Amino acid sequence: MAEEQAYHVNKGLECIKALRARPLDPLVVEEALAAWVETSEGQTLDRMSSDEAEADHQDISKPCFPAAGPGKSSMSRCHDQGLGGSNSCDEELGAFIGDSSMHSTEVQHYHVYDHSGEKVEGVEDADSILVQSGADDGVEVWGGDEESENSDVDSGEPDPEGSAPADWGSSPISPATRASDVETVEGDEIQKLLEDQSRIRKMTKAGKTLVVPPIPSQERPTASEKPIKKGHRREIDLIWNDGRVFIDRWCNPTCSKVTVGTVRAKCICGECPRVCEQCITDSGIENRIWYHNLADIPE
């Protein structure tokens, strides 16, 4: 199909090139237009039959379309026939312009022909394949052709392999009740499902009741529920100076952040003791300056 289309396109381009090389005589065009006006005025609707249109198209399709196939080479009749001869394409194009069916607003009938000029069989059958657009309600879909419908196989009986018969048809449903029925059914089923789930939750079985512990309250603990007081951690700092090492030991509250350097931190939780067994004997414990963080330490 693609080769035939390419073949016709090439031949059409050859005709266009020939017309550009030798344009039509203006007198021929005027005579063709005058003849068309005379025929169109006296024409009636009864003369616009399909047989006449088919005959007109047969006469038109002969000049510029050669009888050779896509694989054969042939010269178009649109070329000149010598210096003294007349251009046959001019006369035929004038007849083509004079065809009133090309300017008619009525429905045109088109026919397909092969390269020999004969009508292609089976082309008109393609019109019956077209499906009319419209509502799809009440339309049944049937599979297979006439031979399959008239076959001896009964669609109602299961096949030898045991598969169940399938109904490929569709029952007509009115559009007015289709959407409402679906919504009603879905609503009833959902409501019934919710009621069943609620009834199951209320039913308790012996020995299978799930006991969920209560959520702990966010209230502050009482005096009896206070946690154990936090203690101290021992920290050591080593300082080297001219081959000598100075060791500094101290305690910091456990709740304080561990930092680099000699930092005497301050309790931030309010529950750590001031001294412990390790730092109670440290010298200058009463005069020690407690810092909360490094920013509080003077330089």
UniProtKB/Swiss-Prot annotation:
Pfam families: Paramyxo_P_V_N, zf-Paramyx-P
Organism: Rinderpest virus (strain Kabete O)
Protein name: Non-structural protein V
Protein encoded by which gene: P/V
Location of the protein in the cell: Host cytoplasm
InterPro entries reported in the protein's UniProt record: Paramyx_V_Zn-bd, Paramyxo_P/V_N
Other comments on record: Highly virulent strain of Rinderpest virus can blocks the phosphorylation of host JAK1 kinase, thereby blocking the type II interferon signaling as well.
Binding site for Zn(2+) 2: 255, 267, 269, 272
Domain of life: Viruses
